[in-house]
Amino acid sequence: VLLSVGGDADTESPEKKNLGGVSIVDLSMDDFRGLLT
């Protein structure tokens, strides 16, 4: 499941950590990198 809602991020990959209840997987890698910096 690409869209994770709630605290189920524990079972997801580090790249799929929940952000505000919405998985950051929905964002492009560029946006993802932007969040890290």
Swiss-Prot record:
Keyword list, A-Z: Developmental protein, Glycoprotein, Secreted
Domain GH18 as annotated: residue spans: 1-37
Main location: secreted
Post-translational modification: Glycosylated.
Record GO cellular component, one term: extracellular region
Superkingdom in the source lineage: Eukaryota
PROSITE patterns on file: GH18_2 (PS51910)
Localization per record: Secreted
Role played: Cooperates with insulin-like peptides to stimulate the proliferation, polarization and motility of imaginal disk cells. May act by stabilizing the binding of insulin-like peptides to its receptor through a simultaneous interaction with both molecules to form a multiprotein signaling complex.
Protein name (database record): Chitinase-like protein
Organism: Heliothis virescens
Highest classification ranks of the organism: Eukaryota, Metazoa, Ecdysozoa, Arthropoda, Hexapoda
